[in-house]
């Protein structure tokens, strides 16, 4: 018969508790996992299952759970999980920004959906591109790659005896700027064409003021914008795959080795 004293029981619970905090923090901000369609009980259950599979292979944590250093260690696990999840979320933030820019140029900024996650209105173009990116994300099994990265982080960023490097935020800021730049390059052709149409409409208004620019310009921008989106989608799929590959490479080779 197995017997446990109180110290052994607290040690067992704490060794399971530390990885669960990091995984649960990651699920709270990571793409797909942070969706409200996945309720809190499912997130806690999934993070508990992953932690239960991982913690026997991790070094023993000597920090006392109910102590000052234990509280600091909890904060560090939360911060590491949020940083990893936020890095993965950069792709969808870029897609949302690209969709907002396209919708604004097409004159569809008024056509919005209420986003339950951000609690703000999202343009219909942004929502469409976000769903497309989500399909690509799931098709390439990127959610499984993200889970493996979180598990690898326990070895490159150990729970005990590791202090989070401040340089991680500067490296993340530099990488996020490159991601957003790629997103702008994706929508740049549509922006140039629609801005050219607006410029031509302004010239027509100067040459013949009796022409109703609003009755011509709005449907023209809408038709050309939808036509450009039609040609953009085949180009967007390999573009998204490249960004996702760069994202996984950055998290594996840069973020986990700081």
UniProtKB/Swiss-Prot annotation:
A Pfam short name: Bac_export_1
Compartment(s) where it occurs, according to its Swiss-Prot or TrEMBL record: Cell membrane; Bacterial flagellum basal body
Keywords: Bacterial flagellum, Cell membrane, Membrane, Transmembrane, Transmembrane helix
GO biological process, one term: bacterial-type flagellum assembly
Family: Belongs to the FliR/MopE/SpaR family.
Transmembrane segments: 10-32, 44-66, 71-93, 128-150, 154-172, 179-201, 211-233
The protein, known as: Flagellar biosynthetic protein FliR
Chief site of localization: membrane
Bilayer topology annotation: Multi-pass membrane protein
Function: Role in flagellar biosynthesis.
């Amino acid at each position: 018969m197995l017997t446990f004293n109180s110290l052994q029981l607290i040690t067992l619970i704490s060794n399971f508790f530390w990885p669960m905090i990091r995984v649960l923090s990651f699920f709270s901000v990571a793409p797909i996992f942070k969706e409200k369609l996945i309720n809190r009980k499912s997130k806690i259950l999934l993070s508990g299952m992953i932690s239960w599979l991982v913690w026997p292979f991790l070094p023993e944590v000597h920090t006392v759970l109910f102590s000052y250093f234990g509280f600091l260690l909890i904060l560090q696990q939360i911060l590491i999980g949020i940083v990893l999840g936020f890095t993965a979320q950069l792709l969808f933030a870029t897609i949302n920004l690209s969709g907002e820019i396209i919708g604004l140029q097409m004159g569809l900024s008024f056509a919005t959906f209420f986003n339950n996650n951000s609690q703000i209105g999202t343009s219909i173009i942004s929502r469409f591109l976000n769903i497309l990116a989500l399909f690509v994300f799931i098709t390439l099994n990127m959610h499984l790659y993200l889970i493996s990265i979180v598990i690898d982080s326990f070895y490159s960023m150990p729970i005990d005896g590791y202090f989070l490097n401040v340089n991680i935020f500067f490296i993340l800021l530099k990488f996020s700027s490159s991601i957003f730049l790629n997103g702008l390059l994706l929508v740049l052709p549509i922006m140039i064409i629609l801005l050219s149409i607006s410029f031509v409409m302004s010239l027509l208004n100067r040459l013949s003021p009796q022409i109703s620019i609003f009755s011509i310009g709005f449907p023209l921008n809408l038709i050309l914008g939808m036509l450009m989106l039609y040609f953009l989608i085949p180009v967007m799929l390999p573009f998204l795959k490249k960004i996702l590959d760069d994202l996984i490479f950055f998290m594996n080779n840069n973020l986990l080795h700081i």
